[in-house]
Regions:
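Metal-dependent amide/peptide-bond hydrolase catalytic core
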Residues: 1-158
Length: 158
């Protein structure tokens, strides 16, 4: 329709977002913390709920929930989400953690995501990552020189 009506568009760039500046010092320290915190386990009722919700939503999944901890990657893994945390990461050393709060393959901003995140499946994931943040911060405070190393790396990373 735009072509048929000779519609034109003027684009004005008002702001832009930077990619996340990864700090390997913090990444390794907080990953160590994540290995020390037990990952969530799910009840038969939660697994049944997950299976039912994925069927209702028409998702390609049998209700499988992720359990465990992925190995730490050698290189940063791009994630397809928008966040202003990436801007913050260019000012101070920053770490972000995430955990499963819904079945594999559930699209974000989908009603099935909200329904899973709002029940015990989501609560367990959120509590897990909160414990990991607390444990990681404890390790950061207890590991001599870690804050200085994180800042040093931050200053060296473009």
């Amino acid at each position: 329709a735009a072509l048929m009506t000779d519609t034109t568009v003027d684009i004005e760039l008002v702001a832009s977002c930077s990619e996340m500046k990864v700090n390997r010092v913090l990444t390794e320290l907080y990953y160590d913390a994540m290995t020390q915190v037990p990952t969530p386990t799910y009840t038969p009722e939660e697994l049944d709920f997950a299976k039912q919700i994925t069927e209702e939503a028409g998702l390609i999944n049998d209700g499988t929930l992720f359990s465990g901890l992925e190995p730490l990657e050698d290189e940063p893994v791009p994630i397809a989400i928008g966040t202003d945390a990436s801007q913050v990461s260019h000012t101070v050393p920053l770490i972000t953690l995430s955990a499963a709060t819904m079945c594999k393959g559930t699209p974000l901003h989908h009603w099935a995501a909200a329904k899973q995140a709002g029940m015990t499946i989501g609560q367990k994931g959120m509590l897990y990552v909160a414990r990991c943040m607390a444990e990681g911060t404890k390790l950061l405070m207890e590991t001599p020189g870690s804050i200085e190393k994180a800042w040093e790396l931050h200053k060296l990373t473009p």
